[in-house]
Protein backbone atom coordinates (compact mmCIF):
# COMPACT_ATOMS: atom_id res chain seq x y z
CA UNK A 1 0.00 0.00 0.00
CA UNK A 2 2.85 2.38 0.82
CA UNK A 3 4.55 1.65 -2.51
CA UNK A 4 1.28 2.29 -4.33
CA UNK A 5 0.81 5.65 -2.62
CA UNK A 6 4.40 6.64 -3.37
CA UNK A 7 3.79 5.82 -7.01
CA UNK A 8 0.62 7.91 -7.02
CA UNK A 9 2.15 10.96 -5.37
CA UNK A 10 5.14 10.60 -7.69
CA UNK A 11 2.82 10.77 -10.70
CA UNK A 12 1.15 13.90 -9.32
CA UNK A 13 4.47 15.60 -8.53
CA UNK A 14 5.76 14.77 -12.01
CA UNK A 15 2.70 16.37 -13.63
CA UNK A 16 3.15 19.47 -11.44
CA UNK A 17 6.81 19.64 -12.46
CA UNK A 18 5.87 19.44 -16.15
CA UNK A 19 3.42 22.31 -15.70
CA UNK A 20 5.97 24.47 -13.89
CA UNK A 21 8.63 23.84 -16.55
CA UNK A 22 6.17 24.88 -19.25
CA UNK A 23 5.40 28.12 -17.40
CA UNK A 24 9.06 28.89 -16.83
CA UNK A 25 10.01 28.21 -20.45
CA UNK A 26 7.19 30.39 -21.80
CA UNK A 27 8.03 33.34 -19.52
CA UNK A 28 11.76 33.02 -20.24
CA UNK A 29 11.22 33.24 -23.99
CA UNK A 30 8.31 35.67 -24.17
CA UNK A 31 9.07 38.03 -21.26
CA UNK A 32 12.63 37.30 -20.16
CA UNK A 33 11.63 37.03 -16.49
CA UNK A 34 9.26 35.14 -14.19
CA UNK A 35 6.82 37.52 -12.41
CA UNK A 36 6.60 37.13 -8.65
CA UNK A 37 2.79 37.22 -8.49
CA UNK A 38 2.55 34.32 -10.93
CA UNK A 39 5.20 32.36 -9.02
CA UNK A 40 3.36 32.81 -5.70
CA UNK A 41 0.01 31.81 -7.18
CA UNK A 42 1.57 28.78 -8.86
CA UNK A 43 2.91 27.62 -5.49
CA UNK A 44 -0.57 28.00 -3.96
CA UNK A 45 -2.10 26.07 -6.85
CA UNK A 46 0.42 23.23 -6.47
CA UNK A 47 -0.28 23.07 -2.73
CA UNK A 48 -4.02 22.85 -3.38
CA UNK A 49 -3.51 20.02 -5.88
CA UNK A 50 -1.47 18.11 -3.29
CA UNK A 51 -4.09 18.81 -0.60
CA UNK A 52 -6.83 17.51 -2.91
CA UNK A 53 -4.77 14.37 -3.53
CA UNK A 54 -4.42 13.82 0.23
CA UNK A 55 -8.19 14.17 0.71
CA UNK A 56 -8.81 11.68 -2.07
CA UNK A 57 -6.41 9.22 -0.43
CA UNK A 58 -8.24 9.58 2.88
CA UNK A 59 -11.88 9.59 1.77
CA UNK A 60 -11.73 7.91 -1.67
CA UNK A 61 -8.67 5.61 -1.50
CA UNK A 62 -9.81 3.33 -4.33
CA UNK A 63 -10.63 6.13 -6.77
CA UNK A 64 -8.97 6.43 -10.17
CA UNK A 65 -5.50 7.94 -9.83
CA UNK A 66 -5.02 8.79 -13.52
CA UNK A 67 -7.60 11.58 -13.69
CA UNK A 68 -6.02 14.16 -11.37
CA UNK A 69 -2.52 14.19 -12.98
CA UNK A 70 -4.14 14.53 -16.42
CA UNK A 71 -6.08 17.57 -15.22
CA UNK A 72 -2.87 19.08 -13.82
CA UNK A 73 -1.11 18.94 -17.19
CA UNK A 74 -4.12 20.08 -19.23
CA UNK A 75 -4.92 23.04 -16.99
CA UNK A 76 -1.25 24.04 -16.72
CA UNK A 77 -0.83 23.99 -20.48
CA UNK A 78 -4.02 25.96 -21.01
CA UNK A 79 -3.06 28.68 -18.52
CA UNK A 80 0.43 28.85 -20.04
CA UNK A 81 -0.97 29.51 -23.52
CA UNK A 82 -3.52 32.00 -22.19
CA UNK A 83 -0.78 33.91 -20.37
CA UNK A 84 1.29 33.84 -23.55
CA UNK A 85 -1.39 35.90 -25.30
CA UNK A 86 -1.64 38.22 -22.25
CA UNK A 87 2.07 39.04 -22.60
CA UNK A 88 1.63 39.93 -26.25
CA UNK A 89 -1.36 42.15 -25.46
CA UNK A 90 0.73 43.98 -22.87
CA UNK A 91 3.41 44.71 -25.47
CA UNK A 92 0.93 46.38 -27.83
CA UNK A 93 -0.57 48.52 -25.08
CA UNK A 94 -3.69 46.42 -24.43
CA UNK A 95 -2.81 44.62 -21.18
CA UNK A 96 -4.99 41.70 -20.08
CA UNK A 97 -4.81 39.37 -17.08
CA UNK A 98 -6.85 36.45 -18.33
CA UNK A 99 -4.17 33.89 -17.42
CA UNK A 100 -3.83 35.18 -13.86
CA UNK A 101 -7.62 35.17 -13.47
CA UNK A 102 -7.72 31.61 -14.77
CA UNK A 103 -5.23 30.59 -12.07
CA UNK A 104 -7.50 32.10 -9.43
CA UNK A 105 -10.45 30.19 -10.86
CA UNK A 106 -8.39 27.00 -10.74
CA UNK A 107 -7.64 27.57 -7.05
CA UNK A 108 -11.35 28.10 -6.38
CA UNK A 109 -12.18 24.92 -8.31
CA UNK A 110 -9.70 22.90 -6.23
CA UNK A 111 -11.17 24.23 -2.98
CA UNK A 112 -14.70 23.31 -4.08
CA UNK A 113 -13.51 19.87 -5.18
CA UNK A 114 -11.92 19.32 -1.78
CA UNK A 115 -15.18 20.21 -0.04
CA UNK A 116 -17.05 17.85 -2.35
CA UNK A 117 -14.69 14.98 -1.52
CA UNK A 118 -15.19 15.54 2.22
CA UNK A 119 -18.97 16.08 2.16
CA UNK A 120 -20.04 13.61 -0.54
CA UNK A 121 -18.80 10.25 0.73
CA UNK A 122 -21.39 8.29 -1.26
CA UNK A 123 -22.51 9.48 -4.69
CA UNK A 124 -25.84 7.64 -4.29
CA UNK A 125 -27.00 10.51 -2.11
CA UNK A 126 -27.51 12.50 -5.32
CA UNK A 127 -30.30 10.15 -6.37
CA UNK A 128 -32.49 11.38 -3.50
CA UNK A 129 -32.52 14.88 -4.98
CA UNK A 130 -33.30 13.98 -8.59
CA UNK A 131 -36.22 16.37 -9.09
CA UNK A 132 -34.49 19.08 -7.09
CA UNK A 133 -31.57 18.68 -9.50
CA UNK A 134 -33.95 19.05 -12.44
CA UNK A 135 -35.37 22.30 -11.07
CA UNK A 136 -31.93 23.71 -10.25
CA UNK A 137 -30.62 22.73 -13.68
CA UNK A 138 -33.49 24.38 -15.53
CA UNK A 139 -33.22 27.53 -13.41
CA UNK A 140 -29.50 27.78 -14.16
CA UNK A 141 -30.13 27.11 -17.83
CA UNK A 142 -32.76 29.83 -18.17
CA UNK A 143 -31.21 32.38 -15.80
CA UNK A 144 -29.42 34.30 -18.62
CA UNK A 145 -32.86 35.27 -19.93
CA UNK A 146 -33.66 37.23 -16.77
CA UNK A 147 -33.60 40.98 -17.38
CA UNK A 148 -30.89 42.85 -15.58
CA UNK A 149 -28.43 40.00 -15.07
CA UNK A 150 -28.44 38.30 -18.48
CA UNK A 151 -25.58 39.14 -20.84
CA UNK A 152 -25.23 38.53 -24.58
CA UNK A 153 -21.63 37.94 -25.67
CA UNK A 154 -20.63 36.88 -29.16
CA UNK A 155 -24.25 36.60 -30.24
CA UNK A 156 -25.15 34.03 -27.55
CA UNK A 157 -27.16 34.93 -24.46
CA UNK A 158 -25.67 32.35 -22.10
CA UNK A 159 -24.07 34.60 -19.49
CA UNK A 160 -25.13 36.28 -16.28
CA UNK A 161 -23.13 39.19 -14.97
CA UNK A 162 -22.71 41.41 -11.94
CA UNK A 163 -20.65 44.46 -12.78
CA UNK A 164 -17.62 43.43 -14.82
CA UNK A 165 -17.77 39.77 -13.73
CA UNK A 166 -19.63 37.20 -15.79
CA UNK A 167 -20.61 33.58 -15.20
CA UNK A 168 -21.88 30.89 -17.55
CA UNK A 169 -24.53 28.98 -15.54
CA UNK A 170 -25.09 26.44 -18.31
CA UNK A 171 -21.80 24.78 -17.37
CA UNK A 172 -23.21 23.93 -13.94
CA UNK A 173 -26.64 23.11 -15.33
CA UNK A 174 -25.18 20.16 -17.22
CA UNK A 175 -24.11 18.58 -13.91
CA UNK A 176 -27.54 18.91 -12.29
CA UNK A 177 -29.31 17.69 -15.42
CA UNK A 178 -26.96 14.70 -15.52
CA UNK A 179 -28.01 13.87 -11.94
CA UNK A 180 -31.67 14.07 -12.93
CA UNK A 181 -31.26 12.10 -16.17
CA UNK A 182 -29.41 9.30 -14.35
CA UNK A 183 -32.03 9.03 -11.60
CA UNK A 184 -34.98 9.24 -14.00
CA UNK A 185 -33.62 6.64 -16.42
CA UNK A 186 -32.66 4.33 -13.57
CA UNK A 187 -36.20 4.44 -12.18
CA UNK A 188 -37.88 3.97 -15.59
CA UNK A 189 -35.37 1.74 -17.36
CA UNK A 190 -37.72 -1.26 -17.45
CA UNK A 191 -40.51 0.64 -19.19
CA UNK A 192 -38.12 2.23 -21.70
CA UNK A 193 -36.45 -1.11 -22.44
CA UNK A 194 -39.72 -2.75 -23.53
CA UNK A 195 -39.66 -3.12 -27.29
CA UNK A 196 -42.39 -2.67 -29.84
CA UNK A 197 -42.45 -3.64 -33.50
CA UNK A 198 -39.32 -4.30 -35.53
CA UNK A 199 -38.15 -1.85 -38.19
CA UNK A 200 -35.02 -2.36 -40.33
CA UNK A 201 -33.90 -5.17 -38.06
CA UNK A 202 -34.23 -3.10 -34.87
CA UNK A 203 -36.94 -3.47 -32.26
CA UNK A 204 -38.37 0.00 -31.90
CA UNK A 205 -39.68 1.43 -28.62
CA UNK A 206 -43.37 1.85 -28.00
CA UNK A 207 -45.04 5.09 -29.05
CA UNK A 208 -45.90 6.03 -25.46
CA UNK A 209 -42.21 5.78 -24.48
CA UNK A 210 -41.21 8.58 -26.86
CA UNK A 211 -42.24 11.22 -24.34
CA UNK A 212 -38.90 11.76 -22.52
CA UNK A 213 -36.75 12.03 -25.66
CA UNK A 214 -39.23 14.41 -27.32
CA UNK A 215 -39.31 16.64 -24.23
CA UNK A 216 -35.51 16.83 -24.05
CA UNK A 217 -35.38 17.48 -27.81
CA UNK A 218 -37.82 20.37 -27.46
CA UNK A 219 -35.84 21.80 -24.53
CA UNK A 220 -32.67 21.64 -26.63
CA UNK A 221 -34.38 23.48 -29.47
CA UNK A 222 -35.67 26.06 -26.99
CA UNK A 223 -32.12 26.70 -25.81
CA UNK A 224 -31.07 27.17 -29.42
CA UNK A 225 -33.97 29.51 -30.21
CA UNK A 226 -33.85 31.63 -27.06
CA UNK A 227 -30.14 31.73 -26.27
CA UNK A 228 -28.64 31.21 -29.77
CA UNK A 229 -26.29 28.59 -28.30
CA UNK A 230 -25.85 25.70 -30.71
CA UNK A 231 -23.18 23.84 -28.71
CA UNK A 232 -25.06 23.65 -25.42
CA UNK A 233 -28.28 22.49 -27.06
CA UNK A 234 -26.43 19.71 -28.88
CA UNK A 235 -24.58 18.68 -25.72
CA UNK A 236 -27.74 18.26 -23.63
CA UNK A 237 -29.52 16.24 -26.28
CA UNK A 238 -26.50 14.01 -26.97
CA UNK A 239 -25.96 13.42 -23.24
CA UNK A 240 -29.56 12.29 -22.76
CA UNK A 241 -29.53 9.97 -25.79
CA UNK A 242 -26.28 8.33 -24.71
CA UNK A 243 -27.59 7.76 -21.18
CA UNK A 244 -30.83 6.40 -22.62
CA UNK A 245 -28.84 3.86 -24.62
CA UNK A 246 -26.86 2.82 -21.52
CA UNK A 247 -30.08 2.42 -19.52
CA UNK A 248 -31.90 0.26 -22.08
CA UNK A 249 -29.16 -1.26 -24.24
CA UNK A 250 -31.27 -0.68 -27.35
CA UNK A 251 -29.55 0.70 -30.45
CA UNK A 252 -32.93 1.87 -31.72
CA UNK A 253 -32.72 4.83 -29.33
CA UNK A 254 -29.44 5.87 -30.97
CA UNK A 255 -31.10 5.71 -34.39
CA UNK A 256 -34.11 7.69 -33.19
CA UNK A 257 -31.87 10.27 -31.52
CA UNK A 258 -29.84 10.64 -34.71
CA UNK A 259 -33.00 11.23 -36.73
CA UNK A 260 -34.17 13.91 -34.30
CA UNK A 261 -30.70 15.45 -34.38
CA UNK A 262 -30.63 15.65 -38.19
CA UNK A 263 -34.12 17.14 -38.32
CA UNK A 264 -33.23 19.76 -35.72
CA UNK A 265 -29.88 20.61 -37.33
CA UNK A 266 -31.35 21.06 -40.82
CA UNK A 267 -34.24 23.14 -39.50
CA UNK A 268 -31.91 25.30 -37.41
CA UNK A 269 -29.58 25.97 -40.35
CA UNK A 270 -32.53 27.10 -42.46
CA UNK A 271 -34.31 29.19 -39.81
CA UNK A 272 -31.54 30.77 -37.72
CA UNK A 273 -29.03 33.01 -39.46
CA UNK A 274 -26.13 32.38 -37.06
CA UNK A 275 -26.44 28.60 -37.47
CA UNK A 276 -26.66 28.90 -41.25
CA UNK A 277 -23.56 31.12 -41.27
CA UNK A 278 -21.56 28.46 -39.43
CA UNK A 279 -22.69 25.80 -41.87
CA UNK A 280 -21.69 27.97 -44.84
CA UNK A 281 -18.27 28.65 -43.28
CA UNK A 282 -17.82 24.91 -42.78
CA UNK A 283 -18.80 24.01 -46.35
CA UNK A 284 -16.86 26.82 -48.07
CA UNK A 285 -14.10 27.95 -45.68
CA UNK A 286 -11.64 29.15 -48.33
CA UNK A 287 -14.04 31.06 -50.56
CA UNK A 288 -13.44 34.81 -50.77
CA UNK A 289 -17.05 35.58 -49.90
CA UNK A 290 -16.95 33.58 -46.66
CA UNK A 291 -13.46 34.67 -45.65
CA UNK A 292 -14.25 38.35 -46.12
CA UNK A 293 -17.39 38.41 -43.98
CA UNK A 294 -17.09 40.74 -41.00
CA UNK A 295 -19.26 38.50 -38.80
CA UNK A 296 -20.01 34.80 -39.11
CA UNK A 297 -17.51 34.13 -41.88
CA UNK A 298 -14.67 31.65 -42.12
CA UNK A 299 -11.81 34.06 -41.35
CA UNK A 300 -11.30 32.76 -37.82
CA UNK A 301 -11.49 29.16 -38.98
CA UNK A 302 -8.98 29.63 -41.80
CA UNK A 303 -6.50 31.44 -39.53
CA UNK A 304 -6.77 28.57 -37.07
CA UNK A 305 -6.03 26.03 -39.78
CA UNK A 306 -2.95 27.97 -40.88
CA UNK A 307 -1.88 28.15 -37.23
CA UNK A 308 -2.01 24.37 -37.02
CA UNK A 309 -0.01 24.10 -40.24
CA UNK A 310 2.64 26.52 -38.93
CA UNK A 311 3.33 24.24 -35.98
CA UNK A 312 4.35 21.29 -38.08
CA UNK A 313 5.36 18.13 -36.25
CA UNK A 314 7.09 19.57 -33.18
CA UNK A 315 5.82 23.18 -33.08
CA UNK A 316 7.58 26.50 -32.78
CA UNK A 317 8.11 26.10 -29.03
CA UNK A 318 6.36 27.69 -26.06
CA UNK A 319 6.58 31.47 -26.29
CA UNK A 320 7.89 31.51 -29.87
CA UNK A 321 4.73 31.26 -31.96
CA UNK A 322 2.13 33.85 -32.92
CA UNK A 323 -1.14 32.33 -31.73
CA UNK A 324 -2.81 35.74 -31.32
CA UNK A 325 -3.33 35.94 -35.09
CA UNK A 326 -6.29 33.58 -34.63
CA UNK A 327 -9.23 35.31 -32.91
CA UNK A 328 -10.20 33.80 -29.56
CA UNK A 329 -6.98 31.79 -29.46
CA UNK A 330 -7.19 31.67 -25.66
CA UNK A 331 -10.72 30.24 -25.49
CA UNK A 332 -12.65 28.73 -28.41
CA UNK A 333 -9.53 28.20 -30.54
CA UNK A 334 -6.96 27.32 -27.87
CA UNK A 335 -6.49 23.99 -29.65
CA UNK A 336 -4.87 25.85 -32.54
CA UNK A 337 -2.51 27.56 -30.08
CA UNK A 338 -1.38 24.13 -28.89
CA UNK A 339 -0.82 23.00 -32.46
CA UNK A 340 1.21 26.08 -33.37
CA UNK A 341 3.58 26.07 -30.39
CA UNK A 342 3.76 22.31 -29.68
CA UNK A 343 3.01 20.88 -33.10
CA UNK A 344 1.25 17.66 -34.00
CA UNK A 345 3.09 15.82 -31.23
CA UNK A 346 1.67 18.22 -28.64
CA UNK A 347 -1.83 17.86 -30.06
CA UNK A 348 -1.60 14.07 -29.79
CA UNK A 349 -0.42 14.32 -26.18
CA UNK A 350 -3.37 16.56 -25.34
CA UNK A 351 -5.81 14.13 -26.97
CA UNK A 352 -4.14 11.24 -25.13
CA UNK A 353 -4.67 13.01 -21.79
CA UNK A 354 -8.35 13.51 -22.58
CA UNK A 355 -8.50 9.86 -23.61
CA UNK A 356 -7.10 8.86 -20.20
CA UNK A 357 -9.91 10.73 -18.44
CA UNK A 358 -12.59 9.38 -20.77
CA UNK A 359 -11.27 5.81 -20.56
CA UNK A 360 -11.14 5.99 -16.76
CA UNK A 361 -14.76 7.10 -16.70
CA UNK A 362 -15.84 4.38 -19.14
CA UNK A 363 -14.05 1.69 -17.14
CA UNK A 364 -15.77 2.97 -14.01
CA UNK A 365 -19.17 2.82 -15.72
CA UNK A 366 -18.54 -0.76 -16.82
CA UNK A 367 -17.22 -1.97 -13.46
CA UNK A 368 -19.70 -0.45 -11.05
CA UNK A 369 -22.70 -2.61 -10.21
CA UNK A 370 -25.04 0.15 -9.12
CA UNK A 371 -27.31 1.19 -11.99
CA UNK A 372 -27.51 4.83 -10.96
CA UNK A 373 -23.72 5.06 -10.73
CA UNK A 374 -23.35 3.41 -14.13
CA UNK A 375 -25.69 5.92 -15.75
CA UNK A 376 -24.18 8.92 -13.98
CA UNK A 377 -20.59 7.97 -14.83
CA UNK A 378 -21.41 7.29 -18.47
CA UNK A 379 -23.36 10.54 -18.79
CA UNK A 380 -20.61 12.67 -17.26
CA UNK A 381 -17.79 11.10 -19.26
CA UNK A 382 -19.76 11.26 -22.51
CA UNK A 383 -20.39 14.96 -21.92
CA UNK A 384 -16.65 15.58 -21.73
CA UNK A 385 -15.91 13.38 -24.74
CA UNK A 386 -18.61 15.16 -26.74
CA UNK A 387 -17.13 18.56 -25.90
CA UNK A 388 -13.64 17.53 -26.99
CA UNK A 389 -14.95 15.96 -30.20
CA UNK A 390 -17.03 18.99 -31.20
CA UNK A 391 -14.18 21.45 -30.55
CA UNK A 392 -11.51 19.43 -32.35
CA UNK A 393 -13.92 18.45 -35.11
CA UNK A 394 -15.01 22.05 -35.65
CA UNK A 395 -11.45 23.39 -35.88
CA UNK A 396 -10.36 20.62 -38.28
CA UNK A 397 -13.46 21.01 -40.53
CA UNK A 398 -14.99 17.66 -39.58
CA UNK A 399 -18.18 19.36 -38.34
CA UNK A 400 -19.37 22.98 -38.14
CA UNK A 401 -18.23 25.10 -35.21
CA UNK A 402 -20.52 24.82 -32.19
CA UNK A 403 -19.12 27.36 -29.73
CA UNK A 404 -18.08 24.80 -27.10
CA UNK A 405 -14.64 25.05 -25.49
CA UNK A 406 -11.92 22.58 -24.53
CA UNK A 407 -12.38 21.37 -20.93
CA UNK A 408 -9.65 22.45 -18.47
CA UNK A 409 -7.72 24.41 -21.12
CA UNK A 410 -9.85 27.22 -22.53
CA UNK A 411 -10.26 30.53 -20.73
CA UNK A 412 -13.41 30.65 -18.65
CA UNK A 413 -13.84 30.12 -14.94
CA UNK A 414 -17.31 28.56 -15.16
CA UNK A 415 -16.16 25.81 -17.48
CA UNK A 416 -13.03 25.15 -15.43
CA UNK A 417 -14.89 24.83 -12.11
CA UNK A 418 -17.70 22.71 -13.56
CA UNK A 419 -15.34 20.30 -15.31
CA UNK A 420 -13.17 19.93 -12.20
CA UNK A 421 -16.28 19.00 -10.22
CA UNK A 422 -17.20 16.56 -12.99
CA UNK A 423 -13.79 14.90 -12.71
CA UNK A 424 -14.04 14.58 -8.91
CA UNK A 425 -17.48 12.99 -9.27
CA UNK A 426 -15.93 10.41 -11.60
CA UNK A 427 -13.23 9.72 -9.00
CA UNK A 428 -15.86 9.27 -6.27
CA UNK A 429 -17.83 6.84 -8.42
CA UNK A 430 -14.66 4.95 -9.36
CA UNK A 431 -13.88 4.54 -5.66
CA UNK A 432 -17.15 2.65 -5.24
CA UNK A 433 -16.45 0.61 -8.37
CA UNK A 434 -12.91 -0.38 -7.33
CA UNK A 435 -13.58 -0.97 -3.63
CA UNK A 436 -13.12 -4.68 -2.83
CA UNK A 437 -16.14 -6.53 -1.52
CA UNK A 438 -16.02 -7.23 2.23
CA UNK A 439 -14.93 -10.77 3.06
CA UNK A 440 -17.22 -12.94 5.18
CA UNK A 441 -15.34 -14.01 8.32
CA UNK A 442 -15.48 -17.56 9.68
CA UNK A 443 -17.27 -16.39 12.84
CA UNK A 444 -19.97 -14.70 10.78
CA UNK A 445 -20.42 -17.80 8.65
CA UNK A 446 -20.59 -20.00 11.75
CA UNK A 447 -23.25 -17.78 13.28
CA UNK A 448 -25.41 -17.85 10.15
CA UNK A 449 -25.07 -21.62 9.71
CA UNK A 450 -25.93 -22.42 13.33
CA UNK A 451 -28.89 -20.04 13.23
CA UNK A 452 -30.30 -21.86 10.19
CA UNK A 453 -29.80 -25.28 11.83
CA UNK A 454 -31.50 -24.12 15.02
CA UNK A 455 -34.48 -22.80 13.05
CA UNK A 456 -34.86 -26.13 11.23
CA UNK A 457 -34.62 -28.11 14.48
CA UNK A 458 -37.25 -25.92 16.15
CA UNK A 459 -39.68 -26.36 13.25
CA UNK A 460 -39.22 -30.16 13.33
CA UNK A 461 -39.94 -30.30 17.08
CA UNK A 462 -43.08 -28.20 16.63
CA UNK A 463 -44.35 -30.55 13.95
CA UNK A 464 -43.65 -33.62 16.06
CA UNK A 465 -45.47 -32.12 19.09
CA UNK A 466 -48.54 -31.39 16.99
CA UNK A 467 -48.67 -34.93 15.57
CA UNK A 468 -48.33 -36.60 18.99
CA UNK A 469 -50.74 -34.33 20.92
CA UNK A 470 -53.72 -36.67 20.31
CA UNK A 471 -51.93 -39.95 21.24
CA UNK A 472 -52.61 -42.08 24.37
CA UNK A 473 -50.87 -41.81 27.71
CA UNK A 474 -48.30 -44.41 26.70
CA UNK A 475 -47.42 -42.36 23.66
CA UNK A 476 -47.27 -39.24 25.79
CA UNK A 477 -44.96 -40.95 28.27
CA UNK A 478 -42.80 -42.21 25.40
CA UNK A 479 -42.77 -38.75 23.91
CA UNK A 480 -41.89 -37.31 27.31
CA UNK A 481 -38.92 -39.63 27.62
CA UNK A 482 -37.53 -38.69 24.22
CA UNK A 483 -38.52 -35.02 24.05
CA UNK A 484 -36.02 -33.83 26.59
CA UNK A 485 -32.83 -32.23 25.39
CA UNK A 486 -29.89 -34.53 24.84
CA UNK A 487 -26.27 -33.75 25.53
CA UNK A 488 -25.79 -32.87 21.88
CA UNK A 489 -28.78 -30.51 22.04
CA UNK A 490 -27.32 -28.75 25.04
CA UNK A 491 -24.00 -28.23 23.27
CA UNK A 492 -25.52 -26.65 20.13
CA UNK A 493 -28.50 -24.93 21.72
CA UNK A 494 -28.90 -21.21 20.75
CA UNK A 495 -30.98 -18.54 22.41
CA UNK A 496 -34.23 -17.47 20.82
CA UNK A 497 -32.50 -14.52 19.19
CA UNK A 498 -30.28 -16.83 17.13
CA UNK A 499 -27.05 -15.40 18.59
CA UNK A 500 -24.14 -17.52 19.78
CA UNK A 501 -23.62 -17.20 23.55
CA UNK A 502 -20.44 -15.36 24.40
CA UNK A 503 -19.07 -18.25 26.46
CA UNK A 504 -19.40 -20.58 23.45
CA UNK A 505 -17.59 -18.18 21.11
CA UNK A 506 -14.73 -17.70 23.57
CA UNK A 507 -14.52 -21.19 25.00
CA UNK A 508 -15.35 -23.29 22.00
CA UNK A 509 -18.82 -24.19 23.32
CA UNK A 510 -17.66 -25.47 26.74
What are these model-derived regions, one by one?
Residues 2-44, 50-227, 392-407, 411-420, ...:
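Membrane-helix boundary/helix-loop-helix interface segments in multi-pass membrane proteins
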Amino acid sequence: MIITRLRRIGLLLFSLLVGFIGFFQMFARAAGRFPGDYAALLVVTAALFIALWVLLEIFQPYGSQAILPSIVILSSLGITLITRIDLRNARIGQPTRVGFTQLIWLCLALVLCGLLVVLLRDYRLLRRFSYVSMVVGLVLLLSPMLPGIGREIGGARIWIGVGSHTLQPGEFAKLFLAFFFAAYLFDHRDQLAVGGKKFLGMRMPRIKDFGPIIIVWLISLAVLVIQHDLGTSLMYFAMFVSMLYVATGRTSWIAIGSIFFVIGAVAASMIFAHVGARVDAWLHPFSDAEFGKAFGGSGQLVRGIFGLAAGGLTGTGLGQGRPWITPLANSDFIYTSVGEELGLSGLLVVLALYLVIVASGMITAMKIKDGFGKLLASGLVFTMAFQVFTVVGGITLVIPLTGLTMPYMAAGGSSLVANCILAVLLIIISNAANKPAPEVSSDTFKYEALAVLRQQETSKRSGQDDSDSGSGSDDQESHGRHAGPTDQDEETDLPATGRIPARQVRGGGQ
